[in-house]
Amino acid sequence: MSNLIPGEIIPEQGEIELNLGKEVKTVKVSNSGDRPVQIGSHYHFFEANKALIFDRELTLGMRLDIPAGTAIRFEPGDTTDVKLVPYKGLRIAYGFNSLVNGSLDT
C-alpha cells in the first residue's frame, strides 16, 4: 500500500526559482490613499487601485513576481519597489477594472 496522498505533490530538494527566464521589471509604487491596498499574485498590475501611484504604461500586461496565491499589501503613504513579470499564454485579459478587456499586446 502506498503512503501517497491523492493529489500530493512531492517537489525535489533545493530551491525553486519562480518565473525563471522571464523579463522582470522593477517599478516604484506609492499608496496615495488613506487605506491599505492589497494586490494578488496574478492581478493585472496595470489595473490596480487608482490610489496606487506608478508608471502604469510600464505595467501593461504585467503581474507581480511573487508565488501564486500570495499578495503584497501597500500601506497608506508607503512607497516600495515591486518586481513584475509578463503574463504568458494568449495574453488576453477581461475583468479586473475593465481597463483592457482584450489583448494585452495592443
Swiss-Prot record:
Keywords per UniProt: Cytoplasm, Hydrolase
Superkingdom as given in the UniProt entry: Bacteria
Localization per record: Cytoplasm
Pfam families xref list: Urease_beta (PF00699)
UniProt similarity note: Belongs to the urease beta subunit family.
Quaternary structure and interacting proteins, as annotated: Heterotrimer of UreA (gamma), UreB (beta) and UreC (alpha) subunits. Three heterotrimers associate to form the active enzyme.
Protein name: Urease subunit beta
